[in-house]
Amino acid sequence: MAIAAELERRGHEVTINLPQIFEETVKPYGFKYVLQQFDDIGVMIDSAAQNSHKFRPFLKWMRNVIDKQFDQLIPLLQEHDILVSTNSEFAVASIAEYCKKPLIRTAYAPFLPGKKIPPAVLPFPKPNPIITPAILWKLMNRMTNFMVKDTINKNRAKYGLAPIRNFGYHAGERSYNYLLFSQHLGNIDPDWTFKWSIGGYCFNDTFQYDEKAYEEMISFVDSAQSPIIFFTLGSCSSKDGNRFSKALVDICKKHDYRLIIDSGWAKTGITLQADKHLFLMKQPVPHNLIFPHCDGVIHHGGCGTTHSVGRAGKPQLITPLIIDQPYWSYRIHQLGVGPEGLKIAKASEQEIERKVGD
């Protein structure tokens, strides 16, 4: 939505195709939008974080999404001049090719095959001299081809397009790859062979929020002078989130810190009793209005939260769960702006306390 707002500010006409869970969020912006016709992403994000889903249902869901994207996006794109998409939308390169329209493919981590940086979607962000990034990318491409290539080629045949041989390289070659992260927080591979540029993160400072919720948070901030820690899992969830929250509360009481918990989509920590040490944020408030008041932030490691904490100049501890979050955890520790990441499911209260001290 931040990208759409900026494009409209520059005079472009924008239509957003978005998951159903964001309908109420997008309405205040006044954008023209079309809801996706396939199963909502929210359930899959939740089950991925919980490690509760099986591979076959996920694979079936993904292939169904590809079929529905061909059905819905082709007539939409034919009415527009350019397609802007994330790199995780597997059908878009073929859709843009069929419609003969340019594709800008965005990414929130270095998701381009290369020789120096491992695939950010794998939980092995540190380059290994034996199992090299190039080897991991080959494995990644084989896995992606297994998941999506046949479904994509089935739809390409339906629309008279030749089959693809390798999804990763086809998508990279048929698009302009625009990296939506900071070159100072993330890293790049100068040897990438695809068309790409890096533009930094697009912060959504126009985020619509509840003024009363913000004022309640500020009242908590102003109520004392003791240090404030902020904890959020963003749009993710973890079955250990409530245990982790309780441990943070106990640590803050022990050291006379204060804690703000953003309950988020999963209502993390919602059963805890608020007091002078704890504020439960039940309504979303923009990061740029929160983080300047905090002394440290503990979070899941999403690209947006990582960049927002970095912009506020605050130390951060990442508890990575899925996708690119281990990559951002690795980068934050590598850059020295936060301690080594913490696995939320395995961390003891003593280990959490040590990390908070760091």
Which role fits each region the language model picked out?
Residues 64-133, 184-186:
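Conserved nucleotide-sugar donor-interacting segment of glycosyltransferase catalytic cores
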Residues 1-2, 82-85, 282-331:
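A donor-sugar binding/catalytic signature common to diverse glycosyltransferases
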Residues 181-296:
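Donor-nucleotide binding loops and adjacent catalytic segments primarily
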Residues 3-12, 25, 250-255:
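A short, Lys/Arg-enriched amphipathic alpha-helix followed by its capping loop at the start of a domain
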Residues 55-59, 116-158:
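Alpha-helical membrane-targeting segments
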Residues 15-57, 126, 131-132:
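Conserved nucleotide-sugar phosphate-binding/catalytic loop shared by glycosyltransferases and other
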Residues 148-199, 207:
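Long, low-complexity segments enriched in small/aliphatic residues
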